[in-house]
Structure formats: C-alpha cells, structure tokens
Amino acid sequence: FELGFPIALQSSMISISCLVLQGVINSFGESVMAASNIINRIEQLVQQPFSSLHAALTTYAGQNIGAENVERVKKGYRQSGAVAAIFGLATIPVAYLFGENIIGAFVKDAEVIAIGTKALHIDSLFYAVVGMIHVSRAVLNGCGDTGFAVLNGLTEVVCRVVYSQVFTRIPFIGYWGIWVTTAATWVTTAFVCVLRYMSGVWQPEKREAKRKKW
C-alpha cells in the first residue's frame, strides 16, 4: 500500500489534468479535436517502448536498491536515459519527413491533416524528454521514493491547467497552444524528475538520514 497508493494517486492526478486539457481542446472545434485525437494515438505508440523500458527499469532499480547497489542503479539510469534519448530524437526526422503521410493514414480531411502534421512536428521535438520522464520515474518509484509520485502528479496537473489557459489565449498561438502546453508540461515534469533523481534522496542512506532528522 505504501508503494502502490502514491503511484496510483499520481496516475489519477495525471488523468484529471488530461481531462482539463481535453476541455480546452474541445473549445476549438471539430478539426482541432480530430487532429488532437490522432496525435494522442501516435503519442501512445511512441510511448510503448518507453513504457516497456519503464517497467524493466523499475524492477531493475528495485532489485539493486534492495541489494544496496546504488552504483548499478545509477548506471542503469544513465544507460536507459541514453536509449530513451536516442529513440526520442530518432522520431524527429520521421515526423518531419513523413508527418503528413502518417496523419493522412488516419484521416482524409485536408484541414485535419494540416493541423495534425504541424502538431506532430511540435510534439516530436520533445519525445526524448518524455523518455527521460519515464526513466526518472522508473528509478525513483523502483527505489521506493513514494512521496515524489504525488509531487510529480501534482506538477503535471498544475502545468496542464496553467499552461493551457496561458498559451491558448495568446493571439498568435491560439489552438497551437494545446501542443505547446503538452511540450511545456513534459519539459517541466522532466526537469522536476531529473532534479529529484540528482538530489539523491532515493538512496537508502539519505532516506534513513532524513527519517532520523525528523
């Protein structure tokens, strides 16, 4: 319960923030809604390798932190981060060269294809950042840093709500603010994740020292 509940709460909070963003998306009409749905499907496909890496790294981190082998956890983090970054960066040329064809495979409406293609161009620049979120969360969750799960979920909620209200109301951005919001949320969340990892509070000796302090 101590490990599972914060992670479940994190997922719930993220889902709530997505619903808030969906409300903003719906306000821009059918073409934007259709393009957003397609981008979400593509994003789900892109995140499959990240999710698999996340699951494997969570187990790896848990086993090694249990054996008090912190250096192996750090090595796993670095190597997994490199894999995630390479995969994420590799999606950029694919999105820019074949984006229109990819969106066209889902829909034939010219306006939706145009919106979806540009949206894919925006988001693909930040898929490597998504990979770092998965890698960082995997290590932190695997090492039992349960308090962070709630903090991280709250970060996503606040970012999606605030950014969506700010960016979509800027006249020269308009509905493109939907995808700018997504990218900005990823960057902020990744920053918080990496910062938490670098703080080292997930390491057993530091957690124990913190408990004694309190």
Sequence positions of predicted segments:
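Short runs within selected transmembrane alpha-helices of multi-pass transporters and secretion channels
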Residues: S51-A55, D123-G142, F148-Y163, G177-V194
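Small-residue-rich hydrophobic transmembrane alpha-helices
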Residues: Q22, A35-G99, V130-N152
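Hydrophobic faces of transmembrane alpha-helices in multi-pass small-molecule transporters and flippases
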Residues: F1-V20, V24, L45-P49, L53, ...
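Short alpha-helical transmembrane segments in multi-pass integral membrane proteins
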Residues: F1-F5, A61-F126, R169-W214
